[in-house]
Amino acid sequence: MIHFRKAVEADAPRITTIYANARRFMAASGNPNQWIDGYPSEADVRVDISADVLWTACRGDEILAVFALIEGPDPTYAIIQGAWLNDRPYAVVHRLASSGKVGGIGEICLRWCLDRFDTLRVDTHADNRVMQRTLIRMGFVYTGIIFCHNGTPRLAYQLDRR
């Protein structure tokens, strides 16, 4: 059975390995540019843990997936080429990655997030077809393009269950 828990400092090396494996998977899937230069690094993981926003999906003691779940507003979402569905309070899912051991774990994580927040916003790289398919299948709506803190564009999606 899959359960969710906040990440703790002791999880940082394992989570860093999951992110490294995710970077390799993305590159092999035609998405070599979304997470570059070792991002997210172990230092990034530790920042998310310290901020109390990093979650893990686990089976027993094994971490199957990791993601940051952050209540908005997100500064990078303030300007969008397009339009959000609404201005309701929302949460953002960032840095979702799978260990690769359970198919569909990304969707399981997003559904868990939707059980906690009526409105979710997510962004992804234009080359991340896997994430785009998951978001569309779940009912997320493409809303436009946002720009990351480093200026790179991302496709923006929103799902509002209200």
Task: Give the location of each predicted region.
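Glycine-rich phosphate/pyrophosphate-binding loop shared by adenosine-nucleotide-utilizing enzymes
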Residues: 2, 61-66, 91
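A short beta-loop-alpha structural element at the N-terminal edge
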Residues: 3-17
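Conserved GNAT-fold acetyl-CoA-binding loop/helix
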Residues: 23-44
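Conserved beta-strand in the GNAT
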Residues: 56, 62-72
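Conserved acyl-donor/pantetheine-binding loop and adjacent beta-alpha core of acyl/acetyltransferases
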Residues: 68-101
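Conserved acetyl-CoA-binding loop-helix of GNAT-fold acetyltransferases
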Residues: 101-115, 133-137
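Conserved catalytic-core motifs of GNAT/GCN5-like acyltransferases
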Residues: 123, 141-155
